[in-house]
Amino acid sequence: MPALKDAIDRASELGAHSFVMGMPHRGRLNVLGNVMRKPMPLIFSEFSGTNYKAEDNQKSKNFDDDNKKWSISGDVKYHLGSSMDRTYPDGRKIHLSLVANPSHLECINPVVVGKARAKQYYCGNRPEDVRNVVPILLHGDSAFAGQGVVYETMQMSKVPDFDVGGTIHVIVNNQIGFTTNPIHARSTPYCSDLGKAFN
């Protein structure tokens, strides 16, 4: 998380004002709470599906337990996204967006890149506008090496109208893909070797 926060801080110093992030379930609650700074009571209310009443719950003393008990069900906590604005002490303002993600590993990659490209387009669609919006993708090591959508998304990186000027990829190299050891998960020494095809 410190590396992610530092990357955002440094990019904002260089002129970026919008960040679109996508990630798997592992570490998502940490990112929501510590990078996005989403209030913990709101995160926990989304677990139980009471988030639509979260603000009312905090303001009203008349919200009874029966209403909480029969509220709509919540989504899986590791699927939730968020969006927020942050102001730095020096006055810089940035917008952070963590895109909601289903359980299908890496399928969020083209969504994040597409959302970033759309934001760049609506910022003015000039070459210098590419710097304003930064896509950030977090991956597990096995998913990065093994899911075809990673390659498919990277393959679009230099295609006109799809180029976002680069994406920050953070790979959590925990060396186990569910129950698969690295030696059985890929044919290359490093999980990030796929990226060499696009340098």
Name each model-derived stretch.
Residues 1-168, 172-187, 198-199:
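Conserved internal helical-beta-strand scaffold that buttresses enzyme catalytic cores
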Residues 188-192:
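Short, surface-exposed alpha-helical segments at coil->helix boundaries
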